Amino acid sequence: MPGKPRGPEKTLEQIVHDLGLYPIDAFEFVGEGLNFTVQRIHGRKKDPQASRHVTGQQLCEGLRQYALLRWGMLARTVLAKWGITRTEDFGRIVFAMVEGQFLAKTDEDSLDDFRNVYDFESAFDAGYRIRVKA
C-alpha cells in the first residue's frame, strides 16, 4: 500500500539464520551501537522528519566506542567470539539488516563504506597497557 511504512520482512532470527555468519547477540549489539552512534552524532530526537543518517565509517567508530564502554579491555575478545574481527563484519551485519528491512540506507551507502575503517588490534588494544614495576 503506497505511503504506508513497511515493516521488516523477516524476523531478526531469520536474518541471522540466512546470513549464517554471526550470532544474534552480534546483531543486537550493532542495533544498540547504531542507536548510541546516532545519539552521539545527532543528539536527542527533536524533529522526527530530520535525517538521523550516519555513514559506515561513523558507525564503525561508534561501535568501537560503544564496545569499549561496555566491555573495556575485553571488547575485542567479545567481538571475536561472535566472529567480528574486521570492520567489514559490521558492514555485513548492517546490510543483512537492511535487506531484512530492519534498517534503511541511502543510495550512496555501500558495503565498501565499512572496508578497512580501522585495524581491530590497534582500535581496541592501543589504549590499554599493563604496567609492571621492575
Predicted features along the sequence, with ranges:
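N-terminal, charge-rich interaction modules
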Residues: 1-40
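A contiguous binding-surface segment within folded domains or other stable secondary-structure elements
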Residues: 34-68
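Intrinsically disordered or highly flexible coil/loop and linker segments, enriched in small
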Residues: 21, 39-47, 72-76, 103, ...
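Cytosolic covalent-transfer regions centered on His/Cys nucleophiles
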Residues: 22-26, 35, 87, 95, ...
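Amphipathic alpha-helical packing elements
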Residues: 54-106, 114
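Generic amphipathic alpha-helical segments used as scaffolds and interaction surfaces in large
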Residues: 17-21, 50, 54, 81
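Long, compositionally biased
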Residues: 105-134
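Generic structural signal of hydrophobic/aromatic residues within well-ordered alpha-helices
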Residues: 8-12, 16, 30, 63, ...
